[in-house]
Amino acid sequence: MSHHRRDSGGDVVHVIPTNNPPPDNWFPNLGDSAVWATEDDYNRAWAMNPDNTSGDNNGPPNKKTRGSPSSSSATTTSAASNRTKAIGKMFFKTKLCCKFRAGTCPYITNCNFAHTVEELRRPPPNWQEIVAAHEEERSGGMGTPTVSVVEIPREEFQIPSLVSSTAESGRSFKGRHCKKFYTEEGCPYGESCTFLHDEASRNRESVAISLGPGGYGSGGGGGSGGGSVGGGGSSSNVVVLGGGGGSGSGSGIQILKPSNWKTRICNKWEITGYCPFGAKCHFAHGAAELHRFGGGLVEEEGKDGVSPNPDTKQTVQNPKGLSDTTTLLSPGVPHNADASYHTGVALQRASSAVTQKPGIRTHQKWKGPAKISRIYGDWIDDIE
């Protein structure tokens, strides 16, 4: 009977043979499934003794784990690894390789299992006790401290942001200045505007020139009659050029509107009855807010377009003795030699034509083609 002794202080399992060794012609029963290696045996052999493989990447690679232990822990791990290799050598070629019988063994001569019966070795009789003691030692039952891999926490760095704390940098500029921001009404979008709002450019001193009628001039030394130029007061920086009786009595800076301020009806207000810009809208919300081009409210007109101010009309008696009156045409209106055409137009628009004053743009209602077919249809009557 053989006696086996395990040296606890070393890293090698010593098997002491007795005087009665097993016979050399030991042939196991090939029909016994315990003689053939299983898939678990292959995995266990790889884990215990990976050096005997051919290194063809069929087994798991021998990688170094992240956060490897210190030198003392590495020594303990190395000792446990040596014991594992010793046990693996104890079971070297103690089973037949089933992959070699199938012709698919990748390890060839480096296989841990026997490819022939002649290579087969008998395991020690007490191999179960040796394996159990090794497993108990690995689990920490015999006082050997288990090696616990402590993962070192990774230090995280926050990438600094280049965005400044000002409100200007919060907007995504498109590289252009906001046009509405520099007007007197200001930008209706405020901080949500995607264009640049430059306060320094807005506060720069500039001279505003308005071309319009007289009545809008304001200045410290402006006179009455003709165009008024504001230049008497030191604080005035508005120059108004216009024609008309303007009385300059203001002493401060006059806020001027654009020349096309509220000269048209707001489409949004006219269709929906609501405008998001409100009083800051550049278009008129109703006929009461409608202005002339250059400034000034438009005078209310009647249903037929007659101006309520009677002194704006100049009438003369018809030279042919007709009872109706005709108005003097404006200098820019061409005259036609056809008397019937003039008579028809004069009878139909006697009250709508207004003499044009300097600096005032008149608004007249166009009533469509009035008997325009007679111009092209008279020649038919002449032929007949």
From Swiss-Prot:
**Entries under SMART domains matching the protein:** ZnF_C3H1 (SM00356)
Q: What is the top-level taxon of the source organism? A: Eukaryota
Please indicate if the UniProt record lists Repeat as a keyword.
Answer: yes
Keyword tags? DNA-binding, Metal-binding, Repeat, Zinc, Zinc-finger
Extract one GO BP annotation from the record: regulation of DNA-templated transcription
Q: Name one GO molecular function term.
A: transcription cis-regulatory region binding
Stretches of Low complexity bias are at 70-81
Q: Where are the zinc fingers (C3H1-type)?
A: 91-118, 172-200, 260-288
InterPro entries membership? ZFP36-like, Znf-CCCH_4, Znf_CCCH, Znf_CCCH_sf
Q: List the disulfide bonds.
A: none
Q: Where is the composition biased (Gly residues)?
A: 212-231
Q: Where is the composition biased (Polar residues)?
A: 50-60, 309-329
User: Which stretches of sequence are listed as region Disordered?
Assistant: 1-32, 46-81, 211-231, 299-335
**What is this protein's name?**
Zinc finger CCCH domain-containing protein 12
Tell me which species this is from.
Arabidopsis thaliana
